[in-house]
Structures are given as C-alpha cells and as structure tokens.
C-alpha cells in the first residue's frame, strides 16, 4: 500500500497531485491491484511541458527510466510507466492541462496473465470534462520489471480490430540499478 502527495511550484505553473495504490495477494500467484490518481494544474504559459499525461508521462524532470523519452513512433514510444493517469491505451485525450482523476485496476486471470481496466475524467482549458476508459490483457513476464499490455477496448472502440494493432501494444521495462538488484534479492515464492 502506497500513498503519495506531490506539489510543484514554478514561475509559470503550479501542480498538485495525489496517488494511492494497493496490491493484494488473495491466493498463491493471484492478485488484484488498484491505483487512484488526482492531479490539478495551473499553467500560465502556452506550453504543454507541465501537463499531466494520460497514456504517457510528461517527464520534464527526468524522474522516469524512459528508453525513448521524446519518441512518438516506434517501439520506444510504446514504453509504459505507471505515472500520472496511468492509462495503457493511447487515448485520444493525451494530456490534462487543468485536472485529471483516474483509477487503474487489474486482477490475475491465470499465473502471469491479468486483465486490466483504467477509468478517468480529464479536464482541459476551454473544454468540457471528458470520460476516458480502456481495458485489456496484461502479461507479467517478471512482475514490475517486464510486462506487456494488449489493449482490447477503449474510447477508440475495439482496438484489436486496428490494422496497426502492434503499435498499440505497450511494455514495461525497468532498468534502474536498484530495481535490478531487488529483482534478484526478492522472495519469489
């Protein structure tokens, strides 16, 4: 169980966010997890550098281990980091410049196979709040270190019918030194 609050204040913006996440093992190799996130932003500039990300974090402070930080196409653009709204599908609303409220849910189906769903509301300046959602199948090859996400349905409709479906598949890959060390020192069973 983790709870966090963050406040950032700059010359041209102020940002406040809070998140709560929990993972519960209810039998051997079976779990469910949920995460709630809220973020609010005041931005006095026309730049989107400080906006909250919906499907991809806006890592202006270089806190995340992104392989393709500024990639918009290709395999590195598909890296997933559970931050900000934490959606696994590339939702049409890509950022929030006023506020965002999101939840990320997942449960084990069988061994490393899970199903997930993300729900949220996004408010951007001069627009009405939007309801956003996605659902899909996840494959935990190594929990928290190497995971694949296969979107099934979202605001875009049935994603599996898309001709470019392979570009929608997301992955998590953690290469931080401390993460790799804890991978080999943690209890596996």
What positions do the PLM features span?
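Hydrophobic alpha-helical membrane segments
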Residues: 117-119, 127, 135
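Short Gly/Pro-enriched loop/turn and capping motifs at secondary-structure junctions
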Residues: 120-124, 153-157
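C-terminal outer-membrane beta-barrel translocator/porin domains of Gram-negative envelope proteins
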Residues: 1-110, 123-125, 189
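Outer-membrane beta-barrel "beta-signal"
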Residues: 137-146, 165-189
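Structural motif
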Residues: 7-9, 119, 151
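Conserved active-site loop/cleft motifs that coordinate metal ions or position small ligands
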Residues: 114-116, 145-152
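Residues that define the transmembrane beta-barrel architecture of outer-membrane proteins
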Residues: 12-16, 95-101, 129-135, 140-142, ...
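C-terminal accessory/binding modules appended to enzymatic or scaffolding proteins
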Residues: 111-121
């Amino acid at each position: 169980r983790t709870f966090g609050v963050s406040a950032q204040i700059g010359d041209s913006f102020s940002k406040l966010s809070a998140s709560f996440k929990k993972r519960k093992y209810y039998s051997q190799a079976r779990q469910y997890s949920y995460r709630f996130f809220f973020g609010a932003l005041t931005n006095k500039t026309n730049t989107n550098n400080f906006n909250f990300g919906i499907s991809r974090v806006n890592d202006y402070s270089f806190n995340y281990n992104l392989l393709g930080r500024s990639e918009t196409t290709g395999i590195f653009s598909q890296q997933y980091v559970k931050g900000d709204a934490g959606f696994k599908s590339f939702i049409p609303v890509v950022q929030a410049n006023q506020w965002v409220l999101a939840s990320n849910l997942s449960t084990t189906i069988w061994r490393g196979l899970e199903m997930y769903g993300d729900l949220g509301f996004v408010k951007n300046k001069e627009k009405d709040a939007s309801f956003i959602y996605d659902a899909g199948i996840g494959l935990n090859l190594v929990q928290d270190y190497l995971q694949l996400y296969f979107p099934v349905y979202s605001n875009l409709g049935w994603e599996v019918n898309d001709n470019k479906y392979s570009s929608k598949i997301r992955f998590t890959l953690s290469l931080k030194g401390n993460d790799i060390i804890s991978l080999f020192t943690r209890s596996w069973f």
